[in-house]
Amino acid sequence: MSPTIQFFLAAAVFMLIHISVMAVCARAFGITVRSISYGVGPTLLTRGTIHVKLFPVAGNVVLKDTREETLYDDDPCLDAYNFQPLWKQVLLPLSGVAALLALSLGIMGTPGWHSFIAAFGQIIDGALAPLSVAQQLLGEGETFARTHGFALVFALFALKLCAFNLLPFAGLNGGQALLAIARAGRPFAAWEATLAKWMLLPGLAMMLAWAAALAVYCWRALGL
């Protein structure tokens, strides 16, 4: 199996597990799930609250949340995410990553733990040097995919994405958990929207840097 196909499948499996675990945990916690989206882009299939989209590389779980929607005055909001105890507000966004981390470490063992710890520095270093450090890291990833089976490739890929999702930026699981801690379990805070916007910028910059690095790597690989 080519590295490209392996990484594409790994991304799809990661997304499926990540989103599913968060949705299951939300319902187990008694939180109303408004919608579950697997993938991005045009919707291919809708079944109840579940939406399957064209590109299986991301997804999201939309929860009942008074910060995002207007509810009836007589609604006690006991099933709203932001009215849950602090531990639920922190644990829920981390649940998908925790499940994937446990699965990946189970596949790779001790070397997987070292890969996970190293991923934080690699993500930052690669974003700061997309034409050098990132190219080297992408090359190492391709070499690993060419010399190992899909299970190990998925585990390594998942460990790197788990590390990325734990970074303290808005829109990522780590940022969501951090904002919940900063609110100290309160349903909302006046400063939260402003802080979230500032927390979003470095995450976007990092993603754009890695997207550019990947584009350059593919361009060079094709000999263009």
Residue spans for each PLM region:
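Small-residue-rich helix-interface/hinge motifs
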Residues: 3-73, 167-170, 176, 180-181
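Perimembrane helix-loop junctions in membrane proteins
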Residues: 26, 30-34, 111-115, 172, ...
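Transmembrane alpha-helix interface/packing and boundary motifs in multi-pass membrane proteins
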Residues: 158-172
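Alpha-helical structural motif
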Residues: 86, 173-174
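Membrane-embedded alpha-helical segments that form the functional core of polytopic membrane enzymes
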Residues: 2-17, 148-162
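Membrane-embedded alpha-helical bundles that constitute the cytochrome b-like, heme-associated redox core
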Residues: 167, 178-180, 213-216, 224
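Functional transmembrane alpha-helices
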Residues: 73-160, 184-210, 214, 221-222
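Transmembrane alpha-helix boundary/anchor motif
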Residues: 15-20, 24, 105, 162, ...
